[in-house]
Amino acid sequence: MRLYQYKGKVKGMQIDLDLKSGSLKTDIKSLKKAARQAIEPELMRRVGMIIKSDELKFAMDHKIYWIDNPIAHIVPGKDYLNPKLKILVDEAINLESKEKLENYLKKWLHDLIKTELFDLVNLINSKSKNNYERGLSFQLFENNGIIKRESVVEIIKNISKEDRVNLRKAGVKIGRYHIFLPKMLKPNAVNLRINLWSAYFQENKETAIPKFGLNFLQNQIKKNQKFLLICGFENFGIFYIRVDILERLFLKIIESTKDRKFKINSDMINLVGCSKENFFKLLELMQYKRKINNENKEEFFVYQPKHKKNKERKIVKKLNKNAPFDKLSELRFR
């Protein structure tokens, strides 16, 4: 838009003024005031358009966009699933319209999180009376829906079959290598989880979510292992494999194992999505030893885990039945 002595346009919900170089400094304040008075009706109109719009987008820079213009951004709240929202609006907007827009965007973001991350949100709303089940839910929440099984082995040992059924109904997978939420590995869920996580912890590292559709990554030795685990990839040397694919591979190995030995087949390799050479290397990193039958020269694998020597083992204290996870009760998605 063009007004007397300046040019300007509205981007999203903010005015971008371009004052002429000939304007006196003493005039700038009055010019801005005049511009904002002229543009107030347009801002009110846009609030109505945004509320009726289906063009909102929550981008990976932690901002909410409307028609390619940022209108709000998130900042850390009480936890990563409950961020605070700050709207990006010009001061020309009246208080009623501002509050109307803010309340709408808060609800929009809340509904987005609740819908896309239902299983994760459900963890912190757990009402289980079993401390071990609640403890596992808390650990999953703390680690964005994915944890290594070895880190909670004592908790797992104390979860009954009935409690495991409850966890399974809640979307929790207790696997051979990881405890995770399978639905949280879907593209929309991964993007949203990472977006909220990085905003809460204010992670500024250059990290990119692996391309969706890939089950296997290689030559990633310098990558952030913790970040990739949150994205759903476990590390083995220079390789990364999706945690759900890793579990499926383990099941295929179990199905093919006889007398503690198994042969690889094309289904296993195709599942992982790598070359045969890399598959052999991956199995070795997973502590499977390749051997050859002296009689028929057939190749097979056996599981031979390496035992840690002279290393202090981390002991996980058992949970007191009368000491519930008080912190978990503080984490409620509102």
Feature-to-residue mapping (PLM):
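Extended, charged helical/alpha-beta scaffold domains that provide interaction surfaces
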Residues: M1-N310
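Short linear clamp-binding motif
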Residues: I315-R334
